[in-house]
Amino acid sequence: MALQPFQDEQLNYFKFVSIVLNEFPKALRQTFRSMWDNNFGHLPGFQPWDDSTAVRNMFLNAEGGRTKVPTNLSYEEWDCTALFQATIYARSFALPDSAGHYQTLSDLYVKPRKLAHGSFHVSVVSPGGNEAETFALAIDQLRLLRNLLCHSASAEIVKGTFDQYVQHTKDAFKALGVKTDPIDVIGGWSESEFPIKEICKLEQAMKEESRAYIEFLEGVSSDIDELRELLHAMKVANANKDDIARLEQKFNDLREAPSQDTPGENSVLTL
């Protein structure tokens, strides 16, 4: 029996899946490597990123010995979730705020913007020309696009929406100094360039991406429980009020994350 031809909206969906699952990790790895080399590569006791066990352990140590990033594996095996953790959520790249407290790039530059759920950054370029802010916004834009795909309740994307997603992606890539040529190539693919074998690969890869995403959210829930216990202990011990306030803010941020990121009942998690 002959297979039914793809509708344009279905083709757009698989193009976007291909961009997110194949091109996002490449862009994020390039960005992470650049961030590492610029911040640590020249420091005594560190080295430029060569993906060796030694340099991955350096990153682990810079994270305080604990991270959700699988540093036991080559960074070529890190998925989008791990790469977001290794960049905008990493302690390694934290910067001081106006009060001198070190915050992750996400806490410092993304959260203050208070984006509505389901929306995107209007611009990923820092208004003040701050490279760290630009990187944070561009990486977060890719995170928002990836999350949107995981939340999708349909395996179809209309042309106008697809064009918007592609433009957001290209803007983020340009801000990160990543070439956009592959995005243009995928965006121009025809149905004949999507053989059934490739569709099956994308479907399986989407399942794995969604599984990793859900595992991350489960980890966030576990972190919330740990923070709740720590916050209680600090209050009992009459800890410094500023420390308690910062911990309470972190607890509230984590508590809000699952409600914003958890896929809905009709989300396309298995295709």
Please give the residue ranges for each predicted region:
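Feature for intrinsically disordered/low-complexity regulatory segments and propeptides
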Residues: 1-148, 152-213, 217-223, 230
